[in-house]
Amino acid sequence: AINRADSGVAPTTSASLVWVLSNFGPNITVFAPTNLAFQQLLTVQITQALIAQGVPPLTAAAQAAFLASTPAVFSTPALYPVLTPTVVKGIVVYHLLGSRAFLNNFPTAATSYPTLLNSAVPTHPGVSLNCTFTGPFVSAATVKGIANPTASNILINPTPEPNGTSDQFFVNGVIHKIDQVLRPQ
């Protein structure tokens, strides 16, 4: 997805997602959807595109399910009209916050936060973050995209014991695994 989003962009410039994600300067938070979450969304998107091209619905659904399940889905030329660099980059940057957001700093009431998409669309409402504490520990957390009908669960690792976290630390930020692809529109 990153390579498709960076099509036509030099990887050594700040406009490149490769640069943002590998540079030690910016602190970021990544909401990383599971493979299943991406497959479900892509299957729907590809099915709709194939039906629009005249492919019968059952055939379109079968082809879409196959294409969405391959690791090469973002580099399949037949899908370039559906998965344009602009669309893919919009989805990827919508999953990135421009600061580190650890679970223990999440609000207990749904609160909107800007994503890196806001650098291109300043008026976009961003994502909504929320968590539930049981004593001093986070027991549940969600992130919701503006076009998602329901909030995505942040998958909390049950270890380290006795209370887990989803905070996966990296040199330039933190990653939280989520169960849906966040949809900006």
Task: Annotate each predicted stretch with a short phrase.
Residues 1-185:
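Mature, structured domains of secreted/extracytosolic soluble proteins
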